[in-house]
Amino acid sequence: MVAYPEISWTRNGCTVAKYPEISWTRNGCTVSKYPEISWTRNGCTVA
């Protein structure tokens, strides 16, 4: 993981420091910049 210090894995997924608005979770990922879009295990949804 040292090769990618901007990526940090958490208990639920991982976050990318370079893109703080993106956070991966156990079920997919969410983009805080675009809260209406959230990726899930099955694909993605657009609120």
Swiss-Prot record:
> Is Ribosomal protein included in the keywords of this UniProt record?
no
Q: Which is one GO molecular function term here?
A: pheromone activity
Q: Where is the lipid attached (S-farnesyl cysteine)?
A: C14, C29, C44
This protein's UniProt keywords: Cell membrane, Lipoprotein, Membrane, Pheromone, Prenylation
Propeptide section residues? 1-3, 15-18, 30-33, 45-47
List localization entries: Cell membrane
In chain numbering, the residues marked as site (Not methylated) are C14, C29, C44
| Gene Ontology CC annotations of this record | plasma membrane
Q: How does it sit in the membrane?
A: Lipid-anchor
Q: What does this protein do?
A: Rhodotorucin-A is a mating pheromone in cells of mating type A of Rhodosporidium toruloides.
Name this protein carries in UniProt: Rhodotorucin-A peptides type 3
